[in-house]
Regions:
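Glycine-rich nucleophile elbow surrounding the catalytic serine of serine-hydrolase chemistry
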Residues: 118-130
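Alpha/beta-hydrolase fold nucleophile elbow
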Residues: 109-120
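N-terminal cap/lid subdomain of alpha/beta-hydrolase-fold enzymes
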Residues: 1-87
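Residue in the alpha/beta-hydrolase core beta-strand immediately N-terminal to the catalytic nucleophile
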Residues: 115, 143-145
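Active-site nucleophile loop of the alpha/beta-hydrolase fold
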Residues: 68, 145-154
Length: 179
C-alpha cells in the first residue's frame, strides 16, 4: 500500500475457486480496478477487452490475490517436498494459514482490518482459513466474503435444494426462527 497509516487501511486476501483455478478471475471479473468486458452471463461482448470496475474496493482496501499451490502459475519447486504438504482440504488450510500469518507479519499489517474473500471452492477454503487463523495463529478477522458459495450447500440450482441447505443453510434460516 502507498497509504501512510497501514493500520487503518483494510487488507483483503482473495482466493478464486477451483480447485485448480487461479485468482485471475477474482482480479479480472470481480474485485480488480479493471474487469473484462463481459455480459451478466459471463460471455465476452464487443469491444473485447477490459473496462473500469466501478465496484472495485481498491480505493479503500489493499487486495492480495493468492494462487495456492497448483493454481495459476503456482507450483511446488522442491521435488523433495511431499505433495501431502499442500494437497487436501486440511493441508491446504494449514499451509495457507501459515502463509497469511507470515505475510501479515512481514508487511506489518497486524493492526489493519483483515478480510478473506473466496469464490466458489474458495468459499470452502476461506471458511476453513477463518477458523485456522483464529485457532492456530491468533488472528481474528474482521470479515469473510463468500462469492458464489455453491460448495457450502446453498446451491439453489440443484433439484433437491431449496437454496438453504447444508451447514450454511441453518445460519441463513436462523433469522426466520426469531420472527
Amino acid at each position: 500500500t502507498d497509504v501512510a497509516n497501514k493500520s487503518k487501511r483494510p487488507i483483503m486476501i482473495s482466493f478464486n475457486g477451483g480447485p485448480g483455478s487461479g485468482s485471475l478471475w477474482m482480479h479480472m471479473a470481480y474485485t480488480g480496478p479493471m474487469v473484462l468486458n463481459i455480459d451478466k452471463e459471463g460471455f465476452p461482448v464487443q469491444p473485447y477487452g477490459v473496462k473500469s470496475n466501478p465496484y472495485s474496493v481498491l480505493d479503500v482496501a489493499d487486495i492480495v490475490y493468492v494462487n495456492p499451490v497448483n493454481t495459476g502459475y503456482s507450483r511446488i519447486v522442491d521435488r523433495r517436498v511431499k505433495r501431502e504438504t499442500f494437497f487436501g482440504i486440511n493441508a491446504d488450510i494449514k499451509y495457507l494459514a501459515e502463509w497469511i500469518n507470515t505475510f501479515i507479519q512481514r508487511n506489518n499489517r497486524w493492526e489493519s482490518p483483515k478480510y478473506l474473500i473466496g469464490e466458489s471452492y474458495g468459499t470452502v477454503r476461506v471458511a476453513g482459513l477463518a477458523l485456522a487463523l483464529q485457532n492456530r495463529q491468533w488472528m481474528y478477522l474482521n470479515g469473510v466474503i463468500l462469492v458464489s458459495p455453491t460448495e457450502l450447500g446453498i446451491d439453489s440450482s440443484r433439484p433437491d435444494a431449496d437454496g438453504r441447505t447444508g451447514p450454511l443453510g441453518a445460519a441463513l434460516r436462523l433469522s426466520l426462527i426469531h420472527i
